[in-house]
Amino acid sequence: GMRGVREWVAAFSEMTGLREAGSVFLEKEEKAYSEVISSLRPKAEGRKVLFYVRSDADLDWRIDVLTDLGMEVAAVAHWHNRFVEHDGRESTYTGIPRIEGVDICGLREAAEDLGVDLIVSGDARTGRTGYRWVGTSTMYIGREGALDWAEKVVRCLSIKPCEDWYGRGSE
């Protein structure tokens, strides 16, 4: 979402004393973001999402984008973590349920129980569940990164899952 952009522009504007220029820049960025999100929203609105991740680190901007698209984050499922996360960027979205210790073999059941339309995960094995899924990465930062990822989310919602996604019928 635009939260990180807003924070960065505010800090940079304050540091350089270019508050007016920062406001003009941010207004243009917000407008460009809103235009694209508005065009994508009808394709995503009302859909439910399950995150399948190692930790909450760096989830907020993704949750912001999904919220802007009119989507509901049903839960954040964490896979078994074998090390301590030192990132420190825990999600500020504390009202979203967390499901701890979900193995890849239990992901399909968790998704079915929640009635989700899409799984968001950095684990490519997620595709084997038979659910639509989208990765967590984008090649860009800021507005461009948020919009690139939003477009991926919407594209993945339009792909029909097939048996090959979870290993059946491909022998």
Language-model segments: residues:
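An N-terminal assembly and electron-transfer interface module characteristic of large anaerobic redox
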Residues: G1-E171
